[in-house]
Amino acid sequence: MRENYETLVSVGTSELLPLSAFLSPAEAGGATSGESHQDKGQKPHLEHSSQGEQPQQSLHLTALVQLVKEIPEFLFGEVKGTEDYSESGSTSLDGEQTSPEVAVVVEACPPRGLLNSLPESPASHPSLATTPTGSSTSGGPPGDWAHGSPLPAIGTDDKPLSIEKEGVGASRETSIHSTQSLGQSKSYLRQERGSMGTGTLPENSPLQGLINCLKEILVPRPQHRGTAPDLPPSLPGLSVLKQTRAEVEAGSLPCPVKTEAASGDCPLQGLLNCLKEIPKAPDRRPSPSGASDLQLQEDPGKRHSGGMRHLQTPPHPSHEAGSMLATVKVEDGWAQSPPVPASCQLSRQGYSSYSTGDNREVRVPRWGPMTLASRASSSPLEALEACLKGIPPGGSSPLQSLAISWSRSPQLGDAGSQRFELQQQGSHSEEATREPLLPLSLQGYMREGPGVQPCGSQGTPTSFSSASSSDGDLDFRSPRSSQGQRLGKGYLPGNSPLQGLENCLREIPIPRPQAAWPCSSAVNRGLKRTEPRNWTGDREGLRGEASEPPHLRQRPGEVPSRSLHQDSPQTCTSTCHQVTTRPGTWQWPQEETATMPSPLHRLENSLRGILPVRPLRFTCVTGPGPSPSPCSSSSFSSSDGEDLRPEPAFWQSPLQQKDQPPSCKDPVRLCPVSGASPRVNSNSCSAEDRERTEPRDCSSLSAGRAEEKPHPPRREDGAERTRQPGPVTNAEGKGAAAGHPSPAPQLEEKPEPKGTEDSRDLEPGHRPPSAAARTQGKLLSGDPPESPSKSPLPTTVLSKWSPTSLQPPCPCGRSLQQELHNLGTALTDKLDRLAAALAGLTQEVATMKTQMDQLRRHPRSLGPKGQGSWQLALPQRPRWVNRLGHRHLPYWRQKGPTRPRPKILRTQAEGCKTSDRPGLSRGKGSLVPQLPPEASLVESSRPTCSSSQQISSTPGGHTVLTAHPPLEHTACHQNPLSPSVPTSVQVPLVASPATSADTEPPAARVAAISIPNQPKEPDSLLGEALSRDLWGGDHRDPRWGAH
């Protein structure tokens, strides 16, 4: 925290030093008016220096300095001595005990008096530090409000608001200190404020409560210290809140923050004490989740001057009603903020409360970290300023949180949400669900907050100011809301200080926010990352500030929760975009970079750490969750990059780790397209794949997968994997299938070389077919190199292997996936061919129909041979049709009903049986009349369609596809010829089922199996696709029958 404070100081060194120097006299206590003068004199100077010297942090520091400077002004407005004293008391809580009542009396003036009261509040500002919102508010905003100019809407209301804020803070501190004189002063101040037109009863006014608290703090310094611990969150957060409010409301940070800065704790000891107590306050505050905060507010108000309670009540109504988001809301927010002695909560709740009610108040937990930051700073004014700056950071990240909070502060809703998130962390109540990402990105979103800044600047700033002063830590709690806005402006420039503060915040959030955030998001460290993951990640990774926290949260270990939950890389990207530090993104995932100004550095770091993990998460998400994780994770991990490698343990996919680089491309490409298919494939092959090569074996299961496996290695170790496709694939694919290396790669490669290989090669990196390819093999991209080299050689062997290796591991699923992929690629070509074939086939069908009608009669009269063969063909055909393509059944049935046509063709074929063409008779799916079996296979789509191939079985039972002569296929019984056809030809062409089964069981079966599992050759794929579509049915029918 001290480092954070130092960072904050360094961020606003000139401002801080002037404030310190300015406050030092005030702290001396002797120069009440002198301090006031110093405040005033230095106020412009500090303001100038803070704004001029440090435009980045100047927003915070300038606001703080201005507030401090204006505190004397406001106090001077009525009674300089009192003002000086109050500010002096604020500055040196322990030393300055000039009667706070004097300051209160001095502030009797409605506008001036109110502001004077506020300066008095600054005097008791340490008490404000003690009081979550009231003290800080009175310290920071009082002068600011009195200033009025910085807070346009607060003009007249400004002071009342400031008074209210201070009243609230005072109420808190009063409750803490229970000083009746303070209560009286508060009543007086409130009366004056009421006359001033604040519309809040003098007693109920938050300023009055703040004044009372300040008086109590100033008079009983020990009590103040007790108060400080009692309401520690108020000072830092309030100061920050004031800054934010002043900035947001007035459009400039000067007054609000300045007041708080001016009222820096005696030596920030009061503030530090408050901060120390802040963790306690947040602890109890989180329990009530806002209600407790109100109670705290109420209690302090009751025990001190009952005004605080009123303040609490008025702030809330005002807060809710506050039409002037900036001014009135600030007032209300401040008023409300003090009611939450937890203060950070209230101030957050200020704008948050008005937007979400008291729930935000419960965001006290943030004050814990803020408390740490505040404690860290012990200089009187510097410590106060550092607390103001670092209070939000203390809770979230010293300066970063503040900057984020300010940046976020403008977005009322967002700030509220953030506050909600923080509150959620504190109370772990409805807020957690409602805005998990905000808390998670609270810091990250704080970065984003600047984007939302305008929204919250109206009301959030007010509440933020209150929270900043009174709930400095709470400001941290909602650094996005209140801190982000301010820092949103200036924290980027002060990135280096902010980064130091960020580091501090990262450390700070971890100790306490982790406890608080875990409440809401620690449920599932890994899984909770989905929503709270960001929170948890932010706090976990100490990058909680960055919007990246979500991404960081989605660390390798965390990826599963989001990845598994989110099935698509898109979701993962948007949700996991925030890695360990995470987004929101996560949305996406890029929000971390785009919307995390909180600390730019932190954002960068978070992005560095998160981006790799998040893609992995996306990959994981894209992959089938935990079960399919191996397959999808394998390719996704590759696509995600190296970060997923840590996740492999989570994903249970060694292949991920091994194949992360190789899959790098594929997963990205596959994630979107193959999100569902890979899951299906992974699910179907999940068990077996895990057994063999959990991730890669899934690929191996699908013929293309094994090839793809080697190919991804090809990316990684293209040569090595290509050389060792089987072993590498298995080893990479989880090394589970040590015995399957050769078969799996061969099988996969074998089919792939023909059709899948080409298609996958066409889409090595990101083609949609890669979804099927990915399901078949996660490493589609790697397929082409190995597939070509391996597939040709193992085509025959692989076809043999295919039946054995492919069948055991989800042959159907993989075959379907491969076929889908092949059909996607080859189907297009085949469809084109089919279109042409259909054109000719239509004519042929018409002719065939006519002939069929005639031949129906003829075949009937032809005799048992024709009928028997026709009958055989008919039954086999339907079977083949069903086997080949269930989806193609309609086409086949359409043609199936035209069985006479096949009969006609077969009749003609019978006539030409002697001259039967083996390729045609085999009906291997040759689209073109196949004199050679191979040629017929290549042209299978055309002959199949054109001949409306009649499936006839010879007595031997071999199914023969008879092509109509017009189809350029002389329908001939393939039964005898198919055996005669070279085995090599039959294998590639996948001889008719009967032929494959009877004549050449090994080769034909291998070919048939390999084809169903995965078309090996492009022609085979085309034939398969065609058979599935329409024409390939006959060709595929035999294959399917064999399959």
Curated annotation (Swiss-Prot):
Residue numbers spanned by region Disordered: 26-56, 113-186, 279-321, 413-497, 528-590, 621-816, 910-929, 1010-1043
Biased composition (Polar residues): 172-186, 566-590, 788-805
Entry keywords, A to Z: Coiled coil, Phosphoprotein
PTM annotation (Phosphoserine): residues: S99, S181, S252, S352
Signal peptide interval: none
Biased composition regions of type Low complexity, renumbered to the chain: 126-139, 630-639
Pfam families: KRBA1 (PF15287)
Coiled coil ranges: 825-858
Biased segments, Basic and acidic residues type: 36-50, 156-167, 528-551, 687-697, 705-723, 747-766, 1031-1043
PANTHER family documented for this protein: PROTEIN KRBA1
Protein name per its UniProtKB record: Protein KRBA1
Source lineage: Eukaryota, Metazoa, Chordata, Craniata, Vertebrata
